[in-house]
From Swiss-Prot:
Glycans are attached at N46, N155. Residues 1-25 form the signal peptide. Human-specific protein that promotes neural progenitor proliferation and evolutionary expansion of the brain neocortex by regulating the Notch signaling pathway. Able to promote neural progenitor self-renewal, possibly by down-regulating neuronal differentiation genes, thereby delaying the differentiation of neuronal progenitors and leading to an overall final increase in neuronal production. Acts by enhancing the Notch signaling pathway via two different mechanisms that probably work in parallel to reach the same effect. This is Notch homolog 2 N-terminal-like protein B. Disulfide bonds join C28-C41, C35-C51, C53-C62, C68-C79, C73-C90, C92-C101, C109-C121, C115-C131, C133-C142, C148-C159, C153-C168, C170-C179, C186-C198, C192-C207, C209-C218, C225-C236, C230-C246. It comes from Homo sapiens (Human). The gene is NOTCH2NLB. GO terms for molecular function: calcium ion binding; Notch binding.
Length: 275
């Protein structure tokens, strides 16, 4: 068999490279759509094809979601997608490293590790940080034991830490370093008007009014039916300077006496207290 000329060999090789279709190559054919996720099959001049993927998809058949669609790369890193695998890697900016570029080669969070006692360091900028402390610790670098952990503030007060000490913000009516002391409002005269008697209560006080006066400070004249004490639509009728009776609606007559008696007991008790 005569040897083939070099020129003929090159011509045959070029023809094969141009027109041969590998057995595994993607092909676009009528009635067959290899591309998924709304990808479009495009044919090359040699008969092979490829899938032109819509935004958000990649891969030979557009079968992968674009892993860079939600860029996980931190600190200015660039997401680089591997289309065939549907995976991505981060190309980090100068000064950062790690799978997601989350580590700085010079930031205090990773060089000096300033957060103590198990605290977590968060980068705020290239050289500033903030520590999230474990329960029981406080301070810029979680260096102090939380003085509020023992709940030193009493009577519903609010505890705040200042350095390694605590400070209590007391509710009205209490005082002291730990808000443990009740303020006796009755030590200051003038709270109760028209001869009312001041009664000290925990964190507050109450005025016991003389007959004929009412209100928080005994500052209002008492009128038995203003406002009406009668319930369920009953009508109040004043029977004396400081007494009343309730006239009930017909549908509540059967239980009206019971309601009236209960209200009268409450009123009589209140009237008795005010005497």
């Amino acid at each position: 068999m005569p040897a083939l000329r070099p020129a003929l060999l090159w011509a045959l090789l070029a023809l094969w490279l141009c027109c041969a279709t590998p057995a595994h190559a993607l092909q676009c054919r009528d009635g067959y759509e290899p591309c998924v996720n709304e990808g479009m099959c495009v044919t090359y001049h040699n008969g092979t094809g490829y899938c032109k993927c819509p935004e958000g998809f990649l891969g030979e058949y557009c079968q992968h979601r674009d892993p860079c669609e939600k860029n996980r790369c931190q600190n200015g890193g660039t997401c680089v997608a591997q289309a065939m695998l549907g995976k991505a890697t981060c190309r980090c900016a100068s000064g950062f490293t790690g799978e997601d570029c989350q580590y700085s080669t010079s930031h205090p969070c990773f060089v000096s590790r300033p957060c103590l006692n198990g605290g977590t360091c968060h980068m705020l900028s290239r050289d500033t940080y903030e520590c999230t402390c474990q329960v029981g610790f406080t301070g810029k670098e979680c260096q102090w034991t939380d003085a509020c952990l023992s709940h030193p503030c009493a009577n519903g007060s609010t505890c705040t830490t200042v350095a390694n000490q605590f400070s209590c913000k007391c509710l009205t009516g209490f005082t002291g370093q730990k808000c443990e002391t009740d303020v006796n409002e009755c030590d200051i005269p003038g709270h109760c008007q028209h001869g009312g008697i001041c009664l000290n209560l925990p964190g507050s006080y109450q005025c016991q009014c003389l007959q004929g006066f009412t209100g928080q400070y005994c500052d209002s004249l008492y009128v038995p039916c203003a406002p009406s004490p009668c319930v369920n639509g009953g009508t109040c009728r004043q029977t004396g300077d400081f007494t009343f009776e309730c006239n009930c609606l017909p549908e509540t007559v059967r239980r009206g006496t019971e309601l009236w008696e209960r209200d009268r007991e409450v009123w009589n008790g209140k009237e008795h207290d005010e005497n």
